């Protein structure tokens, strides 16, 4: 998984009910690491965490209980 002799990078963000902050967190990681894949692991949130993360370009995985 090396491209241009650099390792691939993935950012993994576990979260629960983070709709207030998740958009900024995803944007900041995408700006700091433009080649990285940003994954948000939503741990059964009851708010709009997953929706907001996806809208900001994160790859969202939902973890049901």
Predicted regions mapped to residue ranges:
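Structured catalytic core of nucleotide-sugar glycosyltransferases
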Residues: 1-65
């Amino acid at each position: 998984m090396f491209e241009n002799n650099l390792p691939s990078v993935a950012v993994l963000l576990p979260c629960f009910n983070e709709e207030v902050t998740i958009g900024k967190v995803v944007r900041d990681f995408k700006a700091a690491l433009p080649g990285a894949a940003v994954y948000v692991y939503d741990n059964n949130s009851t708010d709009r965490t997953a929706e907001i993360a996806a809208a900001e370009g994160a790859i969202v995985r939902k973890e049901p209980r």
